[in-house]
């Protein structure tokens, strides 16, 4: 027992600095407690060598005098207080980044698992990211086209936005995420006509996909889907499986976002980051908190979970003078379909809206089962309109929302009073409700609609009503779009 000084000494600035200790005093879940440690630093990386010669990595979570609490990324099984030695490196956790990471698959710790060659890093970056001066942030604008009508028309996503998918167990959030990855692209304006087309610079768009706590079937689904549709070359995949160490889920989204920041701000790419499942991340956070015997907050989650989630979500955005952007779509499953659960509740406070996946629509065989009424994109106004999508976009979206909400009310009233008691106007709203769910919401998994097709489809439904009932659309827009053929 005791400590043995490493021959490399304590020379500042080198990776081999630090001391080797054999002073493990306890193990609690994913944590190792060390005694008699000289000068440990918060978030310092340690190398742990077990008695059988295997090595693991850990990170200092807490320092109290000569005591240090270390979270071990690969799990604590096999660690004892007799043969285990711990070396402090003096470095924070950094990940190698390179443009060559596109098209590759990594585990939750950032190590390649696709049998490809090692990554030749162009830089090593701190996984906590660099702090961004708020005054240097650029307001998110310009739309990312997902090819899904309910998102593009009614919940448009701006480049640099963070907007989560609120889902639940058994709902097709993985299929929707894969469809967004397949179809997502940039849009640009043609100077002469003012129209928008899909951006031809496909090499300027990239996707970073991080899966946390997923089962092998889900991991294989995403790998197979990316490879079969040819989008793998612009995707970087990080996979933390359900049987991987829970603690690894704490660093997986941070490694993914560090990679995204390099691709966006150093390589000039517009990066879409998809994180699934943030509920697994929150559970890992709760497990670490319980092991540290912290005072629990709501439902056992730590009181600092809001702050911790913000350190992930707030890494989306755009920076003045940098060409690229980071757009985040975190996916989380609400336990028992409860939107008041701490994870979706706190996520909703931080992010700029949400896309709500509805079980009732799913039970009626509607795909994608996106319920537009509780869904919201707070930055939609800056991503649409003349010069960005089309001048009628905002008006059409508002009118669709209004008519769908009224249609839902009429449907509820019909269940009470019967169809005979409804007015002719009420019947129009019922017809709209049915066609909206069958034609606009319903869409094939491989059915891509650009924003013009989606808007024209919306107009075909709005023409069910006489112009006088379309109160949300100004007369000038009516004159231009109401009477024209849907095909134009």
Swiss-Prot record:
GO terms for cellular component: proton-transporting V-type ATPase, V1 domain. V-ATPase is a heteromultimeric enzyme composed of a peripheral catalytic V1 complex (main components: subunits A, B, C, D, E, and F) attached to an integral membrane V0 proton pore complex (main component: the proteolipid protein). CDD domains: ATP-synt_V_A-type_beta_C (cd18112), ATP-synt_V_A-type_beta_N (cd18118), V_A-ATPase_B (cd01135). Gene3D superfamilies: 3.40.50.12240. GO terms for molecular function: ATP binding; proton-transporting ATPase activity, rotational mechanism. This is V-type proton ATPase subunit B 1. One of its GO terms (biological process) is vacuolar acidification. PANTHER family: V-TYPE PROTON ATPASE SUBUNIT B, V-TYPE PROTON ATPASE SUBUNIT B1-RELATED. Keywords: Hydrogen ion transport, Ion transport, Transport. Non-catalytic subunit of the peripheral V1 complex of vacuolar ATPase. V-ATPase is responsible for acidifying a variety of intracellular compartments in eukaryotic cells. The keyword Disulfide bond does not apply. Belongs to the ATPase alpha/beta chains family. InterPro entries: ATP-synt_VA_C, ATPase_a/bsu_AS, ATPase_F1/V1/A1_a/bsu_N, ATPase_F1/V1/A1_a/bsu_nucl-bd, ATPase_V1-cplx_bsu, P-loop_NTPase, V-ATPase_su_B/beta. Pfam families: ATP-synt_ab, ATP-synt_ab_N, ATP-synt_VA_C.
């Amino acid at each position: 027992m005791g400590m043995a000084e490493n021959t490399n000494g304590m020379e500042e600035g080198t990776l081999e600095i630090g001391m080797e200790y054999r002073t493990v005093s306890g193990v609690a879940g994913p944590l190792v407690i060390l005694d008699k440690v000289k000068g440990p630093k918060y978030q310092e990386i340690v190398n742990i060598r077990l008695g059988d010669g295997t090595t693991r990595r850990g990170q200092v979570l807490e320092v109290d005098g000569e005591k240090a609490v270390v979270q071990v990324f690969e799990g604590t099984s096999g660690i004892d207080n007799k043969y285990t030695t711990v070396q402090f490196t003096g470095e924070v956790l950094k990940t190698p980044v390179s443009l060559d990471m596109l098209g590759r698959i990594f585990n939750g710790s950032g190590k390649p698992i696709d049998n490809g060659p090692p990554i030749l890093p162009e830089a090593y970056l701190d996984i906590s990211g660099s702090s961004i001066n708020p005054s240097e942030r650029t307001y998110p604008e310009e739309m990312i086209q997902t090819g899904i009508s309910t998102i593009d028309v009614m919940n448009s996503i701006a480049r640099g936005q963070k907007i989560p998918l609120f889902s639940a167990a058994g709902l097709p959030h993985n299929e929707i995420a894969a469809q967004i990855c397949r179809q997502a692209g940039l849009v640009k304006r043609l100077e002469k006509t003012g129209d928008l087309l899909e951006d031809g610079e496909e090499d300027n768009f990239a996707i970073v996909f991080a899966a946390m706590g997923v089962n092998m079937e889900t991991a294989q689904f995403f790998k197979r889907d990316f490879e079969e549709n040819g989008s793998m070359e612009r995707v970087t995949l990080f996979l933390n499986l359900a049987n991987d160490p829970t603690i690894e889920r704490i660093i997986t989204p941070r490694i993914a976002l560090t990679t995204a920041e390099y691709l966006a701000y150093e390589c000039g790419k517009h990066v879409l980051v998809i994180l699934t499942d943030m509920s697994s991340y929150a559970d890992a956070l709760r497990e670490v908190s319980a092991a540290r015997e912290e005072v629990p907050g709501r439902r056992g989650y730590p009181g600092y979970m809001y702050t911790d989630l913000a350190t992930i979500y707030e890494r989306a955005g755009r920076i003045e003078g940098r060409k690229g952007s980071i757009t985040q779509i975190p996916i989380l499953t609400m336990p028992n379909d409860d939107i008041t659960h701490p994870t979706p509740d706190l996520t909703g406070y931080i992010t700029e809206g949400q896309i709500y996946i509805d079980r009732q629509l799913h039970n009626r065989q509607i795909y994608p089962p996106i319920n537009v009424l509780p869904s919201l994109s707070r930055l939609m106004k800056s991503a649409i309109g003349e010069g960005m999508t089309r001048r009628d976009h905002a008006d059409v979206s508002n009118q669709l929302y209004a008519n769908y909400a009224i249609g839902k009310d009429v449907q509820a009233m019909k269940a009470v009073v019967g169809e005979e008691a409804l007015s002719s106007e009420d019947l129009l709203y019922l017809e709209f409700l049915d066609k909206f769910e069958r034609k606009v919401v319903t869409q094939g998994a491989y059915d891509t609609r650009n924003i013009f097709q989606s808007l024209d489809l919306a107009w075909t439904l709005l023409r069910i009503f006489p112009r006088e009932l379309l109160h949300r659309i100004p007369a000038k827009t009516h004159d231009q779009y109401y009477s024209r053929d849907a095909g134009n």
